[in-house]
Amino acid sequence: MKWRANMKFCDMPYQRIDFAEAKKELNALMEEFKRAEDAEAQFEVHKKYYKLTDKVSTQITLASIRHTLDTTDEFYEKEQAYYDEKVPEYSNLLIEYQKQLYHSPYRKELEKKIGPVAFKNMELAFESVNETVIPLMQEENALTTEYEKLLASAKIEWNGEILNLSLLGPYLKSKDPKVRREACEKQNEFYLSIADKLDEIYDKLVKNRTEQAKLLGFDTYTELAYRRMQRNSYGQEQVEALRRQVKEYWVPFSESLYEKRKRRLNLEHLYFSDEQVYGPEGNPQPSGSPEEILAQGQKMYCELSEETKEFFDFMMENQLLDVFGRKSKAVGGYMTYLPDYHAPFVFANFNGTSGDVDVITHECGHAFQGYLSAKDPIREHADIGMETA
């Protein structure tokens, strides 16, 4: 894949998207699409659409990544707030273009090029967004960003150190029950200190999403959420059947495992602080420092195949894995994608637990998919459903 240009993440230039200019470009594409006289000409316009949306997506994603890398950075906090407001309007513009594509007189030929799943996903998108819900989508974005920053603000005192939620993780899984209990209490103290704010955000989100669903013609938010998650081949009935089977078969099995764990830990009662520990000697621990774990991950991917070696070397060379825990980082982990650089990006918070190894397989598995699909000229093919998360 020599076509893929190398650029370190820190060197990727950021420029705020001018959505008025993006709208102008998109409107010009829609006019050109209308004038196109056959499927081939319309597909050439669609390739220009890819280029425009890749440019916009790259800058939005750069801002989002850099905001989560340091939630105290005022510049990227403002950029995130800007996109929280502007992206819903932009998403609605994209729907207008997609409607032209969907209703093209050359639909059959275009479907052969782009694939039928893309058109099915367009149907779901048409039902998920319109102008009436844009203000609510803007509010929803602001609330989720506020929630993310609230969790990242944790400053938990622990043996003379100040830890965030991610860095407290190892103590929640300590083999010493007293340490586990104390860590849980410290974590709970933090959540209780922000309980009123959490309740407020949750209440606003429930009301917001319910109102969005009603405005779009649904009885509940569940129906809207299925469409936004691109559940294009099954519905609520199938999920309800799965839940019944989980309750009937998996819950009793899970309870039996908890009973075995209680005996293994020599406990009369399994408390909430014991739920993350599997044996009296504690959980399996990754061997080595965070840097050594990452190096071992690179060795593993090098040995798997030529493709995985090429992928992980690319990620390492271009600093596309920011996985070491820091106090100002957002909580959790994710993989995202920077289309202009054909580059996946992995975010995580290594904290010395087995979760560090999970990142090397789970999030890097997503990144490998993104890396491989980057060469596919049909961008819709990279648009995988939520089931793969």
What are these regions (language model features)?
Residues 258, 378, 389:
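Conserved catalytic alpha/beta cores of large enzymes that bind or transform nucleotide phosphates
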